[in-house]
Amino acid sequence: MTELYPLTPPGPSRRSTLRAAGGGTLLLGLGLAGCRSAVSDSSSAPQGASAASQRGGVLNVAVNADFTPALLFAQSGQSLQHRLIYNTLTRYDDRLRPKPELAASWTYAKDGRSITLRLRDDVTFHNGRKFSADDVIFAVKNLQNPVRAAQLRSTAATVTGFEKRGDHELVLKLAHPVNNLFDLFEFMIITDSETVEDAVTGKKLIGTGPFKLKKWSPGSGLSLTRNDRYWQAGRPYLDGVELRVIAQADALISSLRSGQSQLSFDVPGKSLGAVKNDPRLAITNYDTGAGAVYLGVNTTVAPLNDRTVRQALAWAVDRDRLLDQTLGGYGLASAAPWPKSSPAFTEANRTHYTHNPGKARQLLKSAGHTKLELPLLHLALPGDTAIAESIQYDLRQVGVHVTLQPTDGATAQKKLISQGMPALWTMGHGFAQVQPSTLAVSAYPFNEAKNTSKYRSAEYTKVVQEAWTEPETDTAAANALHEKISSILLDEAFLIDLVVRGRVQVTADRVHGVTLNKFSYLNLDHAYLV
C-alpha cells in the first residue's frame, strides 16, 4: 500500500493580491508570467494575516446570478455557496497536493485499484445527524446518477465497490486506476442523504459546512447563518453570510464602493480599472485558470462541420484585445485551455492560434465561403455580453456575421449539458486547473464521450482514456499524452479557447481570510471582518 498523507507543507500560494493606493498602484511581479497579478507594497500583509482575527459580523457577497438548485451537483456558474454549506472529502493546496477535510487520512493501493479513507468522527450535519461512511457512499452514488448531470460523473463511475470498516473507515474499489480521484474528492460535496431531493429544489440545503441555510429567496439570493456545531473548533468567525443577487454591473460596483457589499467575484473586466483606484477595495487574482473564456462550435451545423472553417474562426479572434479591453488585463491570452500552473501547458500550444484575419479569410475562401451568418449564444450578463460583442466584432472582419443570443445562466447551462447549443456560443469553462485528464473526461465542452459540440473521434477517446489512467508517477508518459490531447483540441478546433483566467476577487479592506477551492467554492472558515 502507498500512503499519500501526511504530505509536506504547502508552498507559496499562486494567488496574488493587487491593492489600490489612492490614484496609483504598485505592482510587484510575483504572479505567473503573462497574468496580471501582483502583491501590494510591504506595508500591507496578505489577506488573513493583517490583523488579529475577530469574531462576529455578517459578510455580504454580491453575485450577478442566483443559485440554481437543480444544478447543485453539476457545477453551475454560481457555486460559491457549495463550501459554505457543505464540506468535501479533501482539498488541494496550490501545488495540487490533497489535504484533509472530512477524510482525515487515506491509503492508496499500489495497483491503483482501491483507496482506504479514514474519516473524521466528530462531524455532524446541520440537522444533528452524525457523519459516517454511509454518507460518502451516498455522495459517490449520487454523482453516478445521470440525473445529477455531474461533470465528474465518469470518475465517480469508476468506483464499483464499497467496503465499510466501521462507521469511519471506508474502502473505495475502482474498476481501473485513475489519476484524478482527488479531483472528485474536492468537487464532491457531502450532502444529507435524507433531504437531497429537497436540496435540488432549494427547499433544504443540509450539509456539514460552517454555515446553515437560513433562507433562499429566488432571484434575490441566499441567507446563511453560523453553524455553531461546526467541526473546526472556534470556526467560522463570521455570524453569517448573505449572497445578494445584483445583476447590473453599475449597481454591483456601487454596492462594493458604498460598503453594502464587501466581497464579489463578478465585477466585469472593463470595470476593474475603476475598482482598483478605490483605496477601500482590493483585487485578488486567482491565476490558476479556473475559468477560461472560449468560443464553442456545434460541429453538426454546416459549414462548421468543416474543420477548416473552425480553424478560420480560431485565427479570427483577437485574444490580446479581448484580454486587455474586455477582461481588464486579468488572464492569459491562449489558444489552449491550460493555465501556466498545469503540467499540460506549453508556450507553443498557447500561441498556436494568434490574431491573423488574413489567414482566417484565406481558410474560409478555400472552404468556399466569403460570408457566413450564424447565431452566437452568450450569458445575458454585462461581462459576458462584452465578451460576445468583442468576438462578434472580430468575426465580422473576416466575413462571419453573428447574431447575439443573450440567454439566462440556468437555460444556457441546460443547453450546455443537453447538447442544445446553437452554431456558436461563448461561455467560460473550468477543469483545466486540476489534473489535465479531468478536462477531457468531465467538462461538458471537452468530454470525449459526449461533449456540447457533438464532436466524436476514436483517436480523441483513445488518447483521453490513456491519459486518464496513466499513473502520475510516469511524468514523461503523462506529458506525452497531454500533448496529444492538446494537439487534437487545437487541430480540430471544436472548442476555441481564447483567454485562460481565474476568478477575480474584489474585497473591502476590512475583509480578511477569503479563499476559493479549485472549483470556485467559497471557503470562509477563517474569514473575518475588522
Which residues does each predicted region cover?
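N-terminal secretory signal peptides
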Residues: 1-13, 23-33
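Gly/Pro-rich hinge or "lid" segments in bacterial periplasmic/extracellular proteins
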Residues: 185-236, 240
